[in-house]
């Protein structure tokens, strides 16, 4: 998978479908990677340009210290990715953490997105990285594959 330099980090991404088609960008949940939306990408890639990416610190993207894993930075990464790939007015689809990013993009950068699908998320303040330590440990031991099948 290709890496792209955006916002001071390297982001791993997949870019599928016709390049001149309307674009959909999928933003996964915390602890997941591009495979989370694999089935959805397969369903849309014949008629849409479909971009899936790993957030900084996740999957194949550059590992980062905790102080660079806040939602504002992740939102800036996503905006920079949309601009770098020239997705124009894309449809943004975000689940959980991806939903937090989508809400911020819609409010702060409406020039980048035409529509947003926000799932399993809210406009509440996000949980701190430290509060997720137990979940992080469980996923490191068992992986995310069993959970992805249910999403």
Residue ranges of predicted features:
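Active-site loop/turn elements of alpha/beta-hydrolase fold enzymes
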Residues: 55, 97, 121
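Short acidic-hydrophobic surface loop/beta-edge motif
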Residues: 2-6
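Conserved HGGG/HGGXW glycine-rich cap/lid loop of the alpha/beta-hydrolase fold
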Residues: 7-67, 81
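Conserved acidic catalytic loop of the alpha/beta-hydrolase fold
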Residues: 72-90
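Flexible "cap/lid" loop of the alpha/beta hydrolase fold
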Residues: 100-108, 112-146
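Conserved alpha/beta-hydrolase "nucleophile elbow" surrounding the catalytic nucleophile
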Residues: 28-30, 90, 94-99
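Residue in the alpha/beta-hydrolase core beta-strand immediately N-terminal to the catalytic nucleophile
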Residues: 54, 91, 114-117
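Hydrophobic alpha-helical packing elements
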Residues: 40, 70, 74-77, 131, ...
């Amino acid at each position: 998978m290709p890496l792209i330099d955006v916002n001071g980090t390297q982001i791993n991404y997949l870019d599928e479908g016709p390049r001149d088609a309307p674009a959909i960008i999928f933003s996964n949940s915390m602890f997941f990677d591009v495979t989370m939306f694999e089935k959805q990408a397969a369903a849309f890639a014949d008629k849409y340009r479909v971009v899936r990416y790993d957030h900084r610190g996740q999957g194949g993207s550059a590992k980062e210290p905790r102080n660079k894993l806040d939602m504002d930075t992740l939102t800036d990464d996503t905006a920079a990715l949309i601009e770098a790939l020239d997705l124009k007015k894309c449809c943004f689809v975000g689940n959980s953490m991806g939903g937090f990013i989508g809400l911020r993009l819609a409010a702060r950068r409406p020039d980048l997105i035409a529509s947003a699908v926000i799932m399993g998320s809210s406009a509440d303040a996000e949980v701190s990285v430290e509060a997720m330590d137990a979940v992080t440990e469980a996923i490191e031991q068992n992986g995310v594959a069993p959970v992805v099948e249910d999403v």
